[in-house]
UniProtKB/Swiss-Prot annotation:
Stretches the record annotates as Disordered: 1-81
Biased composition (Basic and acidic residues): 51-69
Family statement drawn from the similarity comment of this UniProt entry: Belongs to the OXR1 family.
Compositional bias ranges of the Low complexity kind: 71-81
Swiss-Prot/TrEMBL keywords: Mitochondrion
Provenance organism: Debaryomyces hansenii (strain ATCC 36239 / CBS 767 / BCRC 21394 / JCM 1990 / NBRC 0083 / IGC 2968) (Yeast)
Protein name: Oxidation resistance protein 1
Amino acid composition bias (Polar residues), ranges on this chain: 1-14, 40-49
PROSITE patterns: TLDC (PS51886)
């Protein structure tokens, strides 16, 4: 047994042949997770990476660098709203409202730059069953294929042989979401985003996940600052502005979506729904509920306890492709 004298910092003993006079210095290697764990156990006061660990393992991403990285991402492409007829007069969705909703969607759905109108009270008539039918992805896909130009016999045979049932399964897994927009008798706009298509449930079972949220677009008059002149104050008072509010899933309960042949309910606690509309698609009510921690959707008053409303317009938009 001999001591490695070529490396003064090394105090370990190594086995060498009798004729070997020099030991190779240890190879510098990247510390493993186990190495770092052992160091932390020997130094209980150190709960974070040391400076040497940061140099070896690469720079740690802090909040500032993360913000710079996110701000450097390219902006989303211009959104296109498809489905309005030229004769449709009461259009509930505009670019500004769509952009506000889009910014809160899951990242995979924000990338879609086309939204498709699935159901409109004005264009498709007043019927809850029609809303359910048109929100079904299978029905939407059949309508899409029906409107496609016909292909030759050979192309259709090859396409069916290559796709088969595999494509059918994939189509159902494509990312989709739906935006519901309601306009009441006071011209207030509000609604929800749901991650699944609306459908009648035979049993009382909630569906949907934490990506769902409620929203409202309300008019308000901004309070003028003290530095404003009387002319500026009067102009502010005369020009109400639109304020968009969203109420995200709180996780308190899983009562996200429930729908049947009599009503649609979004969010529920203590027998009260964040948004509820009846089978006539005319009467509705909004309560504050634990599911979303929301305000009354059709009221600008923060102390309102219940918000009954009449539906003057209703639209359902699909975000995501069918094939």
């Amino acid at each position: 047994m001999v001591t490695d004298k070529t490396n003064a910092s090394s105090s370990s003993l190594v086995d060498t042949p009798a004729d070997e006079t020099e030991v190779q210095p240890p190879i510098n290697r990247r510390p493993t997770f186990l190495d770092r764990l052992m160091r932390r156990q020997t130094s209980p006061s150190s709960m974070e990476y040391s400076e040497s660990d940061k140099k070896k393992d690469g720079p740690m991403e802090n909040e500032q660098s993360k913000g710079v990285r996110e701000s450097s991402l390219p902006p989303l492409s211009q959104l296109s709203l498809k489905g309005y007829k030229s004769s449709t007069k009461r259009r509930l969705l505009d670019d500004e409202l769509a952009s506000n909703i889009r910014n809160l969607l899951p990242a995979r759905l924000q990338l879609f730059d086309e939204w498709d109108l699935v159901y409109s009270l004005e264009q498709h008539g007043v019927s809850l069953n029609t809303l359910y039918q048109r929100s079904n992805p299978d029905y939407q896909l059949s309508q899409l294929r029906k409107n496609k130009p016909e292909v030759g016999y050979g192309d259709s045979v090859i396409s069916s042989m290559m796709s088969g049932n595999v494509n059918s399964m994939r189509e159902r897994r494509r990312p989709q979401g739906y935006v519901l927009i309601i306009k009441d008798e006071n011209n207030s706009k509000f609604g929800c985003f749901v991650n699944e298509h609306l459908r009648p449930m035979d049993q009382k079972r909630y569906y949907g996940n934490g990506e769902c949220f409620l929203w409202k677009s309300e008019l308000f008059t901004p309070s003028p600052s003290n530095s404003n002149s009387e002319e500026d104050i009067s102009s502010h008072l005369a020009t109400p502005q639109i304020r968009f509010k969203a109420f995200m899933y709180t996780g308190i309960n899983d009562n996200i979506i429930y729908s049947n042949h009599d009503f649609i309910a979004i969010g529920s606690s203590k027998g009260q729904n964040g948004l509820w509309i009846d089978r006539s698609l005319y009467n509705g009510v909004s309560y504050s509920c634990d599911t979303f921690g929301n305000e009354i959707l059709n009221s600008n008053s923060g102390d309102a306890k219940i918000g009954k409303f009449k539906i003057m317009g209703l639209e359902l938009w699909r975000v995501g492709t069918l094939e």
